Amino acid sequence: MLPLLIALQFLTSLPIRLPAMPTPRQQGRSLLHYPAVGLFLGALLWLAALLLEGASPLLQAALLLALWVALTGALHLDGLADSADAWLGGFGDPARTLEIMKDPRSGPVAVVVLVIMLLLKFSALLVVLQAQQPAALVLAPLLGRAALLALFLCTPYVRPNGLGQALAANLPRSRALMVLALVVIGCLLLGATGLLALTLAGVTFLLARRAMLRRLGGTTGDTAGALLELVECAVLVGLALQVGR
């Protein structure tokens, strides 16, 4: 139960209070619950969409996007912004890229990337709501957080003594594979929609991981957050394109 609470506290803005400071082992095990947190967030978005039925589609999409950002505290958007600044400003140099990621200030590249990301999500939400295909509301956050579990399972963490290092070092690998297998099976049970979502998430994961390895030799907390946002966006936009035909 405690690892689940740790995952909820870290991945959401919900007021979760832990009984004590988590141990590295508990932090590592919390990764196993990341897909469950994604499923929970997706269920909340689906419920909100049901409650907003009858409202203007534009307003529905805007409110759902605002809720999505509020529930996550914009944590992963921050990672995306930092990664965007660092990737451009690092000029291919790993040390400079890592240094820029530590800078709390956001440059113009970060702002542009965030605007594009939010516009894409808003537009995709509008399409899936109008097409009455709410499965995308669940699949996007689920696969985004499953991607984090997969990332820490197979990718080195490059910042020594960071939180990510404790997560990766204490992740039960056999259980992680079982959790990922359950996610895959669950998506496949949804038929063509689930298969498309899995494919989009998988391709995005592989491309992003390849970029991380080439530039940094591994991942950081910021690039992990960027990966989550990219996977969510790819799944949401891809499913919107499917239903919009």
Swiss-Prot record:
Localization: Cell inner membrane
Signal peptide: none
Gene Ontology CC annotations of this record: plasma membrane
Biological process, per Gene Ontology: cobalamin biosynthetic process
Transmembrane portions of the chain: 31-51, 57-77, 109-129, 134-154, 176-196
Principal EC category: transferase
Topology of the protein relative to the lipid bilayer: Multi-pass membrane protein
A Pfam family matched in the record: CobS
EC code(s) of this entry: 2.7.8.26
Catalysis performed (reactions): alpha-ribazole + adenosylcob(III)inamide-GDP = adenosylcob(III)alamin + GMP + H(+); alpha-ribazole 5'-phosphate + adenosylcob(III)inamide-GDP = adenosylcob(III)alamin 5'-phosphate + GMP + H(+)
Keyword annotations: Cell inner membrane, Cell membrane, Cobalamin biosynthesis, Magnesium, Membrane, Transferase, Transmembrane, Transmembrane helix
Annotated family: Belongs to the CobS family.
Function, as annotated: Joins adenosylcobinamide-GDP and alpha-ribazole to generate adenosylcobalamin (Ado-cobalamin). Also synthesizes adenosylcobalamin 5'-phosphate from adenosylcobinamide-GDP and alpha-ribazole 5'-phosphate.
Protein name as it appears in the record: Adenosylcobinamide-GDP ribazoletransferase
Organism: Stutzerimonas stutzeri (strain A1501)
